């Protein structure tokens, strides 16, 4: 079991406690007859057996699985309870209860983001598994209390099947149905928190996050990820292991750890989300899924930058610098000229949020026709994203004659990026201000009265 996860400190830890003994003891009851069942949640159709430990408070499970009549999954730990289920290591009636080491007996654990877990649990939590491995969301995070500040502890997690069933999702009824018996069991693995081992004071002073844990369906995975079967239900377990300095610590392996089970973290492993409500909730609550949000711009927070899809859509409707100039009538030319007029101070008179948005997200410099020098992006006042108007915007001309930028310097205001040197030296172009009649092919585009006269593309 342990060999699947290569940790440099694991070998050094061998003289403190027998980690292999703990792992073997913790996982040995996976297929052991008589192992006690996970406690039922109200309305959970799985559970028709008495639980042998006190369940942690959790919202009602809304998994609409049908055809299942049991939920067998072992869990081990101390007989006391905390904010989650803390189960007995002696599950069978003919075994004596193991007295826990005082270093772990008083440890309590509180699940972080419990309200979010409850919200997912009511819908039926799904977790994506991929060949390369996928992180969990919500992330498993806990706050720990009651450790000995000067003692060393290891924190680890494993995942146990809830039952011996395989499931499928019925879209017509928006419910999970039993599809048959479970696939062969995957290799049992545990995930060690990368900061293990550490002093109790270190663990208790901050929230412990298992954000590095990844789930995979690759049976040949050699990266130490947790291997799960898709379309099966799993229960995460959290273990606290006291690093016993005694040389014969393997004799006390069952005394030196405590296990916690949060039933609201139970989930179904999937390769793609089945319940569209789960998809929506993940997008709405995951800060890394902002690009997938499809909501009214009026609902955007003022400091929220819209996703790349909206940005590229706006960019596609504005202009293409390399395209040929379109033919315009007089009204369109006047609108375009007024759109890009500037006041004497150099500030753009227009307040077009699309171009202001482009000035924040495009590359540091845009090449000018002919490769003369780099044209900067404006650093004018930012407009809040909720004012973005993608429809009804007058189409600017696809030509650099109406370029909205004035000063030929590189852009220094986007995320503090350093300037990039222009591909050609600036002195060679000094004094060559742009004039629309320099190119005979474009001389007839403007009349004497409508030609823009305040465009100066020369360096300052």
From Swiss-Prot:
Q: State the DNA-binding region(s).
A: 116-294
Q: Does the keyword Nuclease apply?
A: no
**GO annotation, cellular component aspect:** chromatin; nucleus
Q: Where is the composition biased (Basic and acidic residues)?
A: 331-344
Q: What does this protein do?
A: Probable transcriptional regulator involved in developmental processes. Binds to the palindromic T site 5'-TTCACACCTAGGTGTGAA-3' DNA sequence. Is required for normal development of the pharyngeal arch arteries. Acts cell autonomously in the pharyngeal mesendoderm and influences the development of neural crest-derived cartilages secondarily.
Instruction: Tell me the Pfam families matching this sequence.
Output: T-box
Q: What is the reported phenotype of gene knockout?
A: Fishes display defects in the ear, pharyngeal arches and associated structures such as the thymus.
Task: List the PANTHER family.
Answer: T-BOX PROTEIN-RELATED (PTHR11267), T-BOX TRANSCRIPTION FACTOR TBX1 (PTHR11267:SF104)
Q: Where is the composition biased (Polar residues)?
A: 67-84, 320-330
Q: Does the keyword Nucleus apply?
A: yes
Region of interest: Disordered: 30-53, 67-99, 317-355, 376-400
Compartments, as annotated in UniProt: Nucleus
User: Under what name is this protein listed?
Assistant: T-box transcription factor TBX1
**What tissue specificity is annotated for this entry?**
Expressed in the ear and mesendodermal components of pharyngeal arches.
One GO MF term: protein homodimerization activity
